[in-house]
Every structure is written in structure tokens, then in C-alpha cells.
From Swiss-Prot:
Top-rank taxon, per record: Eukaryota
Organism encoding this protein: Schizosaccharomyces pombe (strain 972 / ATCC 24843) (Fission yeast)
Transmembrane segments: 2-22, 397-417, 448-468, 481-501
Name this polypeptide is given: Uncharacterized acyltransferase C1718.04
E.C. number(s) listed in UniProt: 2.3.-.-
Entry keyword Zinc: no
CDD domains: LPLAT_AAK14816-like (cd07992)
Length: 675
């Protein structure tokens, strides 16, 4: 990294946008990131076009202090603003075949009983293309390099197209459309990556090759494997490692959504793959490395075969989680992932199929009533209390709306412009892409870009307008010294008003979401449906819990339902000071975990005697250590617990000396994360 000051300054400026757009960004497993040495960080799924690399660089800088170089598409690198930021961050441009691909003439097909590498054409002009070009099937069904061209209607590819989708379109009577991308020389990219890695740099890339909004990962490109093998073949003692990173979002395109970055264990490429690569058996070596990376990414991402399955899995997680349990955000992601693994393994089991259909029906009933799952389980039948809560929350919502109104009006031009421009850009990207479903991976990027460009101009205009109004109408005498402070005050005042509106608005939105179920409970015709649905939910909870507890041990040997069902009960909704305490304690945990190289927010594969040691247990204890290593681990765990208890006791003393404010709703509950 040549210009560290420019890197840190630009990252700090853009971090303001990230903190403004996302309500919460968490990291899990950051202790696994090597602090020094060459590192290729492999991130997936690529669900937010330019936001993903920005969050990745920001969290790596905050958590482990490493500056990261990103591989960026040359098409984006040539854009004025994106190129400027990419150069400031030391990004490496990569020319992608799909950016240069052109639509081929006619249709292509293969003969069912013939050579699958022989591609036949109808009304095609294969001789216009060259050997080495890439033949691309639609919807990312597959690609292959052209080995030889025999005529305008016959060519051979280096390897046959594999996969059910590729075979279906190529064997269809009408044939398949296709694109042809020219051969690209990536020597510069490989040399530049190798040069930086040898110097101990951290290179991050997205091996899917582009952003998308699909619920599953796209096939990985071979570039990451070639970069790693090329570096190790020439510098075998450089100590290069690969690190998987899962980019997990809750509604990535929405304002004030949440994100979790999960880092897996570092991978070292086996020597046999490097030897195969040197021996010109590159296909075997590259495929072996890609399989390693793909398996590692599966352990840190949530992969669902389709959107409907993802919704069922998230509903299943809410039904399985006891109401008194409050999961941390990384734990929600981990439980979703394990449920998907279990579903894919047992999806043909009649019990799973029957439960799948029941949950789908339950979700549809929630949608028709306009309710969310956590609102059903928390509804209590007492008309007087329901009416009291409804009136109280409506009054509170009115006051909060008044507080948020000035800032909302000031910022409304940015909101309107960002929404319209992002929708247009998403539509254009969807039209040009063969892998996107709705183009949602573009929305957050363009919302942030529009806000970054418009906000300084808009608030400068407000400041000038304020100064003009005060000077023209002599609201402050021109002879007063305070007249010179007007530009400074107005420059800071309007952003502060907008930020206050943001905080008021968050609380107001949470209260607004809680009003509908209260209103429905007061209507006799709707109340019956709500309470019938509540009974159905109780039955679903019992069925889901029973089935997971039966099937879980078959797939996960260390599965223990008591670790969830016996967790301490969730306390009452925290006050402002209690939330501040929780945030401080979380910070202390992070600091202590770095000190002891232990991630307290992740599942640690400890020996069996240590699995009954809980950080916040009222009476922490451990079984007698069987050897010196376990004893050392127990000592470290006790040290961390004692430090946290002492810190928590000091802060609780401070809190008790203050007046506790009235109960307020400050954030969405865990149950709302995936609704």
C-alpha cells in the first residue's frame, strides 16, 4: 500500500456512509484473520455491488488493522468516480470476459448421442470468432473455451458443458442462444497480485466474478486458484494463505438494514496441488483449489436453493428459538446456515415435507393479516390493555414523528433522487445481466453514490439560504460579532437535525410496526383469526422443535438442544443506559478476545470438558482439566470472566445512580431480522 494516508482518509469518509446506511454491521471470527503475511481473502456471496468491498475493507481495518487491496472490474475502474476511489484504495483492475461478450448469431445445440464437445449451429457464423474465445450460455449455465473452428456451423470446445441446465438448453429442439467473449490476457493481473503478495499484502476478491441477488452462490471463477498457485509455484516459502469470508445480509438493499461478516479458518494450499500446477497438470490443480475454497465458503455463508426455501428456513428458525432467548446477530446467521444444511440433507423425509408445507401456509396467513411472526407470539388477549397500548403507542408515534419531520423534509430530495436513480440503474443492470433476479444488488450501491454526491451540495445550499435570509432581513445586527458565526453554525446545524431525525425515525418505525396487530386484536372479526393463528403457531413450535431435536444429532454429532433451551431468560426491554452498558461490555469482550486470541462471539471447538463453561454463567465452573493444555485454557477463560464481571459491576453502579428513563422501543427485535 503506497499511500496509506489517502487510503485511511478515503475509508474514513466512506465509513460515515456505511454507518448511516446500515443499522448494524457485525463481524464473527475476526480472530482468524492473520495479522501479517500474504493473504488472499475470498468473499461471497457478492450481494452488494460496491458496498461489499467497502464493508470488507472497513471491517478488516477496524478489527485487525489490515489494509486491503480489492480486485475490481476494469469496466467499473474506467468510471470516473469509481476509478478515482479504486486508485485511492490501491485496487487492481481486472478485465472480465462477460463485459466484452457479444451476442452470437443463430442458435447452438449438441447432438444427444454424439461428441458433447462438438457444438453445432443453426444460422451461425462461427468463423467470425477465434480459437481461444469463450462461449457463454445464458443465465450463467456454463462457459467453455473454443478449441477449434471447423465451419460456420461447427466448432469444438475444450471441455463439454456440464450441468442439468446446460444439457437442457443445448439438447432442446430450438437450440440455445449464446454469447462469445474474446480471449483476455490476464498476465498483468497475475503478476501484480503475485508482486503484492510476496511483499505481504492482503488481496480481497469475489470469486463469483460479479454481483448478483440470487439466494445461492454462483460457480467460482478459476482466477483465484491461478493467482494462489502461480504465487506459490514461484515463491513456495512466502507463507500464502486463503481466508474465506461470508457476506451475510438481512435485506441488503434496504436503508438501515443489518450485515454480518463471518471469517472462516485460513487455508493453506497443499503441496501436491502446487506440484501438479508446475507439472502442467493445471486443470487438476486449479479444480482442487476451487473445491477447497467452495467448501470453505459453504461453512461461512447461508446457501438456499431458492427464495421460498430461504423464507421457510428463516420461519423455522424463529419457531425453534424459544421466546425468552435473544440471539446475537452472528448466532442468527449460524443457526440459519445449520438449518439449511439439515433441510438439504433431509428434504425428502416425509416429516420434513409435511412441515415445509405447514410453514408455507403459516407464512401466507401472516402475509394476509399483515403481521409478523414475533407479533403473533407476543399478543395477549386483554381488550383494556390492548386499547391502552394502542393509544399510548399512537401518542408516542405522533411525538416521534414530529421530532423526525424537520430532518426528513431537509433530506427528502436525497431520498427521492436516490430511490429513483437506484431503481433505474437496477433495471438497466437486470436487462444486461444473465444471472440477476431483480437487480437488488445494485440498489444499495447507487443509493449511497447518490447520497454521497447530493448531500454536500444540498446542505451547502441550505447553509447559503440560511445566511442569505439572516443577512437580508437583519435578524442579527450586522455590527454584531455573532453575524460571522452564522455560516459555521448553519453548516453543522442542518446535518445534526437530519441525524436527530434518523434516530427519532428508527424508534418511530419500530413503534409503527407494532400498531397493526394491536388494532387487529380490537376488531372481533380479525381477532378470532389472529388467535387461531396463535394456536397454530404453538402447534408448529412443538412440531419444529421435536423434529429438529430428533434429526439434529444424526447430522451434527455435537448437537445439544439444551444449550439453547436452557439459556438464561431474556430480560425486560433494556433502557437507554442498559443498552449503553451492553454496548460497552461487547466492546470489552472484543478487546479481551483479541488479547487472548479467542473469539468469544463464535463457537469454539473446545475439548469436551470445556463445553460446559459459559461466559455469563452465575456460577462458572469447569471440570478438572485432563492435561496442561486444558488447564491453561480454563485459566484464560476465568481471567476473561473476572475482568468482565468487574467492569460490569462498575458500570452497573454508575447506572443505579441515575434516574432510569421510561421504557422505550429503540430497535427491532431479533425476530424482525428476516421478516
Amino acid at each position: 500500500m503506497q499511500h496509506t494516508f489517502i487510503y485511511d482518509t478515503c475509508l474514513w469518509i466512506l465509513s460515515i456512509l456505511i454507518d448511516f446506511f446500515f443499522r448494524e454491521v457485525k463481524t464473527r471470527g475476526s480472530f482468524r484473520v492473520p495479522r501479517k503475511g500474504p493473504l488472499i481473502l475470498v468473499a461471497a456471496p457478492h450481494a452488494n455491488q460496491f458496498v461489499d468491498p467497502l464493508i470488507l475493507m472497513l471491517q478488516l481495518r477496524r478489527e485487525v488493522g489490515r489494509r486491503t487491496s480489492i480486485l475490481v472490474a476494469a469496466k467499473s475502474y474506467r468510471q470516473r468516480f469509481i476509478g478515482l476511489m479504486s486508485r485511492a484504495f490501491g485496487a487492481i483492475p481486472v478485465e472480465r470476459a462477460q463485459d466484452l461478450a457479444i451476442r452470437g448469431e443463430g442458435k447452438i445445440f449438441v447432438v444427444a448421442e454424439g461428441d458433447k464437445t462438438a457444438i453445432h449451429g443453426k444460422d451461425t457464423l462461427f468463423t467470425k470468432h477465434s480459437v481461444g474465445d469463450t462461449l457463454l450460455l445464458p443465465n450463467n449455465y456454463g462457459s467453455s473455451h473454443i478449441a477449434s473452428i471447423k465451419s460456420d456451423t461447427l466448432l469444438y470446445v475444450k471441455r463439454e458443458f456440464r450441468g442439468e441446465d446446460a444439457e437442457r438448453v443445448l439438447l432442446s429442439p430450438e437450440g440455445s442462444s449464446y454469447k462469445v467473449a474474446p480471449e483476455i490476457d490476464q498476465t498483468y493481473v497475475y503478476n501484480e497480485v503475485r508482486r503484492r503478495l510476496v511483499k505481504g499484502a492482503c488481496i480481497a476478491l469475489f470469486p463469483e466474478g460479479g454481483s448478483h441477488d440470487r439466494p445461492e452462490m454462483l460457480p467460482l471463477k478459476a482466477g483465484v486458484a491461478i493467482m494462489a498457485l502461480e504465487t506459490l509455484s514461484q515463491h513456495p516459502d512466502c507463507g500464502l494463505q486463503l481466508l474465506p469470508c461470508g457476506m451475510n445480509y438481512f435485506h441488503p438493499h434496504r436503508f438501515r438494514s443489518r450485515a454480518v461478516l463471518e471469517f472462516g479458518s485460513p487455508l493453506s494450499i497443499p503441496t501436491e496441488y502446487v506440484e501438479l500446477y508446475k507439472a502442467k497438470k493445471r486443470r487438476e490443480a486449479i479444480q482442487g483449489v476451487l473445491d477447497m475454497i467452495y467448501d470453505a465458503l459453504l461453512s461461512v455463508t447461508v446457501q438456499a436453493p431458492d427464495y421460498e426455501t430461504l423464507m421457510v428456513i428463516q420461519a423455522c428458525r424463529r419457531l425453534y428459538k424459544p421466546a425468552h432467548i435473544q440471539f446475537a446477530l452472528p448466532k442468527v446467521v449460524d443457526l440459519n446456515r445449520k438449518l439449511i444444511v439439515g433441510y438439504n440433507h433431509f428434504k425428502h423425509d416425509p416429516r420434513v415435507i409435511r412441515l415445509h408445507d405447514k410453514i408455507l401456509l403459516y407464512n401466507r396467513q401472516l402475509y394476509r393479516l399483515g403481521l409478523r411472526d414475533h407479533q403473533v407470539q407476543s399478543l395477549q388477549y386483554s381488550r383494556f390493555m390492548i386499547l391502552y397500548k394502542l393509544v399510548y403507542r399512537c401518542c408516542k408515534l405522533f411525538l416521534l414523528a414530529l421530532g423526525a419531520l424537520p430532518g426528513a423534509i431537509l433530506f427528502s430530495p436525497v431520498f427521492i433522487a436516490a430511490h429513483r436513480i437506484s431503481v433505474k440503474k437496477a433495471a438497466a443492470a437486470l436487462k444486461a445481466s444473465s444471472v440477476k433476479i431483480q437487480g437488488r444488488d445494485i440498489l444499495a450501491t447507487w443509493k449511497l453514490l447518490v447520497a454521497l454526491g447530493m448531500t454536500p451540495i444540498l446542505y451547502s445550499f441550505y447553509a447559503l439560504l440560511c445566511c442569505y435570509y439572516i443577512y437580508s432581513y437583519k435578524l442579527i445586527p450586522h455590527s454584531s460579532i455573532f453575524v460571522y458565526t452564522v455560516p459555521i453554525i448553519s453548516t453543522f446545524l442542518f446535518p445534526m437535525v437530519t441525524y436527530a431525525a434518523l434516530r427519532f425515525g428508527e424508534v418511530a418505525v419500530d413503534i409503527y410496526k407494532s400498531i397493526r396487530p394491536l388494532f387487529l386484536a380490537l376488531i372481533p372479526s380479525k381477532a378470532n383469526a389472529v388467535y387461531i393463528l396463535k394456536d397454530e403457531r404453538k402447534q408448529l413450535v412443538a412440531e419444529v422443535t421435536d423434529l429438529i431435536n430428533k434429526l439434529g444429532p444424526e447430522l451434527f454429532p455435537d448437537f445439544d438442544p439444551d444449550r439453547i433451551t436452557t439459556t438464561i431468560e431474556k430480560p425486560e426491554r433494556p433502557s437507554r443506559f442498559a443498552r449503553r452498558l451492553s454496548s460497552s461490555v461487547a466492546s470489552d469482550v472484543d478487546n479481551l478476545s483479541q488479547l487472548h486470541d479467542t473469539d468469544l462471539n463464535s463457537e469454539v471447538s473446545a475439548p469436551a470438558p470445556l463445553q460446559n463453561v459459559y461466559l455469563y454463567s452465575p456460577n462458572p465452573s469447569a471440570l478438572p482439566p485432563s492435561d496442561e493444555e486444558e488447564k491453561d485454557i480454563n485459566d484464560k477463560a476465568k481471567l476473561i470472566r473476572n475482568a468482565l464481571r468487574q467492569r460490569m459491576g462498575q458500570r452497573m453502579t454508575e447506572i443505579r445512580s441515575r434516574d432510569t428513563p421510561p421504557e422505550e422501543v429503540f430497535s427491532e427485535s431479533d425476530e424482525e431480522l428476516s421478516d
